[in-house]
């Protein structure tokens, strides 16, 4: 191969890195948290002794660094570029065609498209790279029988280290031997597919795969409980088709030369760039990218960025859920609730489906609101369902919640676990200052306030139930003065659900007990006006601001004056769009 192919690959890799950084930077930050890599011999051996374990270990080793901004996109671009160069080298050795070498980017692009599916395991990319490594060694051996021996050993090595990619190696080796046109020897090479068949049957019988077909395909590298998309098969299929074309149909004894090569390379490069762009546009999980961005801001405490990204119309309850938490963390839920497009009470309480992702979100919510027991339970449940051995984000939460409860032995167990992670070692080490030190916990701005919200009941009682109202009532009942966030969540839930009786009951229970309700927030006063619209004598009891009362009177007058006017919502939005009255009348 000439320098042009390597130059094209480097430029393609740079372009890919820029594209991934611009479009998918938060995707890589999101997928990292679902697997906590531990740099220990026990952890490595636990993975290596399983079929495909070494490739899985390598993938987790790489993916852990996705936790750093900008790193994930460039690491992925590097892996895809490496796979393209390796594929191109093998195709060139098969065909002696410089043009066909460029098409090594086709299976590489297919790998990229597969990796943009959250449920695809990057073990598949590492397995493909290991296949290329063994395939290059295989074709470098000149002696036929020695090469066949190396091939059989490579099959066994790939099965143990990389999983089902051994089947791809067996077919490639057979195609390679057929392409050499060495008479009867090529039929001896059929030994490779036969050995692969026996290995696959063994995998199936030993329950490594659920189906016999899965023992010979990349199905192994997809979430075991979900049906894979067809794109996960494209890389293998493309490489085998190109191998047949290069090794059997267009094979040359000498490298191609001349002007036609330049033309072929140029056309191939343009087609491959187009194919890559089409693949990214088609298979990228574009619908989830905004959520992943908001989730990253939530995880890192960048609350104002969540607010900025949620201006205007919202249609996704997950966005609303994250926005509500951001407002709560900034103590703005009681002031800015109706400045944003919350559709109804479902925006505050997504149902728990026992999945890793939803458990993580609910753990964050309950931690914010001060129900530490439920935050811990959701973290534990989510971690049990993690794609990897552990979820880094949820292990952090388990450390925090056990410190709050004073369960220092359990907290230290999780700290020791996380200290074995190269990425999270420093954070875990910083938590040791709280071990066996109640004063340090109580003085910490994150842990201390949540310890103050612990009720006197047992952990089992606190952890029972996952409904929002009883869950948020726990910290409010335990310490009303410090449970402002939980109180505001409850009040917001009642207002959004139009449950005025519960809203008034909540206010009556605490308005004379806590200092921060000495003057009711504007939206609470608006709610009181709605609840006691026909009982103005009640208004004085809640010390309603006369300006708010006058605004409500004007709102009613304009509504009555424009009855039947289809443009009424637009007419009133500018003046009353952030009021509870506007929400009641025009939200659907």
Predicted regions and their residues:
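Start-transfer (signal-anchor) and selected internal transmembrane alpha helices
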Residues: 1-17, 261-270
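Membrane-embedded helix bundles of polyisoprenyl
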Residues: 11-20, 101-117, 122-136, 150-169
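Membrane-interfacial interhelical loops
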Residues: 27-65, 110-118, 201-233
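Transmembrane-helix motifs of polytopic, lipid-linked glycan transferases
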Residues: 77-95, 109-110, 132-137
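Transmembrane helices and adjacent periplasmic/lumenal helix-loop junctions
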Residues: 119-122, 140-182, 197-207
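Cytosolic-side transmembrane helix boundary signature
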Residues: 221, 227-268
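Internal/C-terminal transmembrane anchor helices
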Residues: 258-285
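Soluble catalytic regions of membrane-associated enzymes that act on cell-envelope
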Residues: 278-462, 475-500, 506
């Amino acid at each position: 191969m000439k320098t042009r192919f390597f130059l094209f690959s480097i430029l393609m890799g740079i372009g890919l890195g820029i594209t991934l950084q611009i479009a998918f930077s938060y995707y890589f930050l999101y997928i990292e948290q679902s697997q906590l890599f531990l740099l220990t011999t026990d952890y490595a051996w636990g993975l290596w002794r399983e079929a495909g374990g070494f490739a899985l270990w390598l993938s987790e080793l790489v993916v852990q660094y996705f936790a750093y901004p900008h790193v994930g996109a460039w690491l992925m671009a590097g892996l895809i570029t490496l796979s393209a160069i390796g594929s191109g080298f093998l195709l060139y050795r098969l065909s002696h065609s410089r043009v066909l070498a460029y098409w090594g980017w086709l299976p590489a692009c297919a790998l990229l498209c597969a990796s943009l599916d959250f449920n695809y395991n990057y073990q598949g990319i590492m397995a493909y790279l290991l296949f290329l490594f063994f395939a290059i060694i295989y074709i470098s051996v000149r002696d036929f029988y020695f090469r066949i021996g190396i091939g059989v050993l490579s099959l066994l090595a790939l099965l143990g280290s990389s999983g089902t990619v051994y089947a791809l190696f067996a077919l490639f080796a057979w195609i390679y031997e057929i392409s050499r046109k060495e008479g009867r020897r090529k039929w001896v090479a059929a030994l490779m597919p036969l050995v692969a068949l026996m290995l696959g049957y063994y995998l199936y019988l030993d329950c490594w795969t659920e189906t016999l077909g899965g023992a010979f395909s990349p199905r192994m590298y997809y979430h075991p409980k979900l049906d894979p998309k067809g794109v996960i098969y494209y890389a293998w299929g493309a490489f085998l088709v190109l191998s047949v074309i290069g090794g059997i149909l267009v094979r040359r004894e000498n490298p191609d030369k001349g002007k036609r090569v330049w033309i072929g390379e140029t056309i191939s490069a343009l087609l491959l760039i187009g194919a890559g762009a089409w693949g990214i546009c088609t298979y990228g999980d574009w619908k989830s990218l905004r959520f992943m961005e908001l989730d990253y801001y939530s995880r890192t405490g960048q609350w104002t960025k969540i607010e900025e990204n949620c201006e205007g119309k919202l249609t996704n309850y997950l966005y609303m859920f994250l926005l509500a938490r951001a407002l709560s963390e900034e103590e703005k839920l009681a002031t800015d609730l109706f400045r944003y497009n919350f559709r109804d009470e479902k925006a505050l309480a997504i149902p728990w489906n026992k999945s890793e992702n939803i458990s993580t979100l609910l753990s964050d919510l309950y931690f914010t609101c001060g129900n530490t027991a439920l935050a811990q339970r959701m973290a534990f449940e989510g971690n049990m369902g993690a794609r990897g051995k552990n979820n880094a984000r949820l292990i952090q939460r388990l450390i925090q919640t056990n410190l709050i409860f004073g369960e220092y032995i359990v907290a230290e167990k999780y700290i020791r676990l996380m200290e074995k992670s190269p990425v999270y070692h420093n954070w875990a080490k910083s938590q040791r200052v709280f071990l066996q030190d109640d004063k340090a916990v109580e003085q910490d701005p994150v842990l201390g306030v949540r310890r103050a919200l612990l009720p006197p009941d047992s952990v089992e009682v606190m952890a029972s139930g996952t409904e929002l109202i009883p869950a948020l009532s726990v910290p409010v009942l335990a310490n009303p003065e410090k449970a402002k966030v939980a109180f505001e969540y409850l009040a917001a839930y009642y207002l959004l659900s139009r449950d005025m009786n519960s809203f008034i009951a909540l206010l009556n229970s605490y308005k004379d007990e806590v200092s921060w309700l000495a003057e009711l927030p504007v939206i609470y006063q608006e709610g009181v006006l709605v609840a006691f619209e026909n009982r103005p004598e009640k208004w004085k009891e809640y010390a309603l601001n006369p300006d708010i009362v006058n605004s409500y009177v004007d709102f009613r007058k304009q509504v009555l004056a424009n009855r039947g006017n289809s443009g009424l919502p637009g007419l009133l939005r500018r003046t009353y769009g952030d009021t509870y009255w506007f929400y009641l009348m025009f939200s659907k």
